[in-house]
């Protein structure tokens, strides 16, 4: 369990609060908008209405006590940048900030952010891949070069074992697991047989995955 400071409780921030709550973490939420704070109250440990660009207000929260500070302010990049910078100045251990464009990410990283997330960009990429390939069922981006795809078993692989196909050597791809009837099995061995009734979870470089599965 970690102690999380969440600044900004718009739609993206609220979704993060819900997920963190489900994972059992302690979350303090901060926003200037009382209505948004009230909306997120069921999912957080504590909440404060306040201006995150005010150094004294942030200092009163005890920034150094949080394991991670997440800045999800939208619609006002200046406030997001100032908040990110102040958090680091006040001793934040890890600052994760939201960006909408690459230029914003560069400024955030130069001014205190340890990591940057692009919710809109990442969702757009997911949708573009997921809904233009009938054999792709899910997609998780690891970084700019690597991803995990849930994909149907290629026709030429059906009835063969993982070891027989030698997927890692041929394609540089790792089979992490298989899914059948909504259940995931990650106990993959060279003897694991592939059928048309399952989907596979494959990890690798984008180029290798695209070539292998014709994405």
Language model regions located:
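Cytosolic regulatory regions of ion transport systems
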Residues: 1-215
